[in-house]
Regions:
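ATP-binding N-terminal substructure of ATP-dependent carboxylate-amine bond-forming enzymes
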Residues: 1-129, 133-139, 146, 157-171
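Structured loop/turn residues at beta-strand edges in well-structured enzyme cores
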Residues: 93, 149, 177
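Basic phosphate/pyrophosphate-binding loop/patch that engages nucleotide-derived ligands
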Residues: 143-151, 209
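ATP-grasp fold ATP-binding core
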Residues: 144-145, 173-192, 214-224
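Phosphate-binding site of ATP-dependent enzymes
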Residues: 195-267
């Protein structure tokens, strides 16, 4: 297997492929998540294998020392010097289960989950449908609303619709939501391209920026309130973990505030 490192262990240990990196805007946070997962899996039971997804979607078994790199670009530069490429059709021979540490598009939206199901490889986390619905903010809001849960007023814009009549749509949105309102891509995470809009002049630039990331954009009423995170483990008898509140440091909590040590605050 070349110079790529594996944790020496008896064959009875479960081989866990920790997939990190990826092709989304959140690949740096994925590196942080992958490091944490790799370090915290009990080595007496599991054999963690660091698997890096490069910017073109290829998979590589990387040396453990690569996990200490500061950025995914640093890892990608050295893939030909110590890492081993894993063809997707060979992945099942390398692992017993995949722990998905990918963030954002093609990692949390059901795409990678569906690929693993086609390859008949078990994985940790939500399935294809739940992942896809969770990433699509418009569909998630519709489902929550059907269950009687309050959601902010939302308008969805397609790129074709906006291109055909940006001025008319801007007037309609201002009449419907007023200011401030919030503009965001429909299928991005970690506050990517999320903008608080406080005036008519700010609306079109915010929408254009959101369209750089997705072909669908949401415009929502602005709601000031707490942001709470609560993880849930299991399906038949789900266990809700202790919730935490994210303490805001700005109007919009961005990726660094939510994930990077020392940048944000939770209680």
């Amino acid at each position: 297997m070349g110079e790529a490192e594996r944790v020496d262990s008896p064959s009875s240990k479960i081989r866990v492929g920790v997939v990190l990196g990826g092709i989304s805007s959140e690949r740096e946070i994925s590196l942080e998540s992958g490091r944490n997962i790799f370090g915290k899996l009990p080595k007496q039971r599991y054999e963690p294998l660091p698997i890096f997804m490069d910017s073109r979607g290829g998979l590589w078994l990387i040396p453990v020392k690569y996990l200490m790199r500061n950025a995914t670009a640093d890892i990608e530069e050295d893939l030909d010097d110590g890492a081993r490429r894993i063809p997707y059709e060979e992945l099942k021979k390398e692992v017993d289960i995949i722990y998905i540490a990918l963030h954002g598009k093609y990692g949390e939206d059901g795409c990678f989950q569906g690929l693993l199901e086609l390859l008949n490889i078990p994985y940790v986390g939500s399935g294809v449908l739940a992942s896809a619905l969770g990433m699509d903010k418009y569909m998630a809001r519709r489902l929550l609303s059907l269950e009687g849960i309050d959601v902010p007023g939302t308008a969805r814009l397609s790129l074709d619709e906006w291109t055909a009549d940006p001025a008319g749509i801007a007037v309609r949105l201002e009449r419907e939501f007023g200011f401030p309102c919030v503009v965001k891509p429909t299928r991005e995470g970690c506050s990517t391209a999320v903008t608080r809009v406080d005036s008519t002049g700010e609306l079109a630039p915010a929408v254009e920026e959101a369209f750089r990331w997705d072909n669908d954009v949401l415009v929502e009423e602005y709601i000031r309130g707490m942001e709470v995170t609560c993880g849930v483990v299991g399906t038949v008898n789900p266990l809700a973990l202790t919730p935490s509140e994210t303490i805001p440091t700005a109007e919009i909590l961005f990726l660094e505030d939510k994930f990077l040590y020392g940048q944000g605050e939770n209680k």
